């Protein structure tokens, strides 16, 4: 007899109104989607909802009537594991391990990062929206199985360094 299958959770943040086609493709097949804020427009949530059920929190740049309906924090249970969602991890006002959480999901920094602290996965998928500085455009996927959470960061756009060829006046030859 086999146990329950792993649950796949797509994690996206800081779209700022831009839901890239690459993000839609990367989220296909997930059981649920978490948006960790700075959504930018309600239609982003509508489009994500066509892929899987969405849990979303309000980010510091989310404004308007639609955003006012979103909570600042959210708790969800996936495969027997509690996940705590907020936009800025610096505003975490509880001890996640003591509260029984398996993961804390956040955004805000635009920097993808995952680390385990005291048995709790802290997961920031980075920004899937407009590129900021030289940070990658990314999202994440969580796998929940047998009471454990594992994360993976998926970079959506290839970062290609551009090194222009130097042109000197040498009779039209590139050097």
Predicted regions and their residues:
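A short, polar/proline- and glycine-enriched secondary-structure boundary/capping micro-motif
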Residues: 21-22, 94-98, 134-135, 160-168
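Short secondary-structure boundary/capping segments
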Residues: 1, 24-25, 46, 73-75, ...
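Catalytic metal-binding/acid-base residues of hydrolase active sites
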Residues: 16, 39-40, 61-62, 89, ...
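N-terminal active-site segment of His-dependent metallophosphoesterases
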Residues: 1-54, 62-71, 80, 135-138, ...
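Generic structural signal for conserved hydrophobic packing positions in ordered secondary structure
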Residues: 14, 48, 76, 85-87, ...
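Metallo-beta-lactamase
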Residues: 66-90, 158
């Amino acid at each position: 007899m086999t146990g329950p299958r792993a649950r796949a959770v797509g994690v996206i943040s800081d779209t700022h109104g831009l839901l890239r086609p690459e993000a839609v493709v990367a989220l296909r097949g997930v059981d649920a989607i978490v948006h960790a804020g700075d959504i930018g427009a309600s239609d982003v949530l509508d489009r994500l909802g066509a892929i899987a059920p969405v849990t979303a929190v309000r980010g510091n740049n989310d404004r308007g009537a639609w955003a006012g309906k979103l909570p600042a924090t959210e708790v969800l249970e996936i495969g027997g594991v509690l996940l705590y969602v907020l936009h800025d991890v610096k505003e975490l006002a509880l001890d996640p391990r003591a509260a029984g959480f398996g993961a804390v999901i956040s955004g805000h920094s635009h920097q993808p990062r995952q680390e385990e602290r005291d048995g709790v996965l802290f997961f920031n998928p980075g920004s899937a929206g407009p590129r900021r500085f030289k940070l990658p455009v990314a999202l994440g996927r969580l796998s929940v199985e047998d009471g454990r959470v594992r994360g993976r960061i998926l970079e959506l756009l290839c970062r290609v360094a551009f090194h222009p060829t130097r042109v000197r006046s040498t009779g039209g030859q590139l050097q």
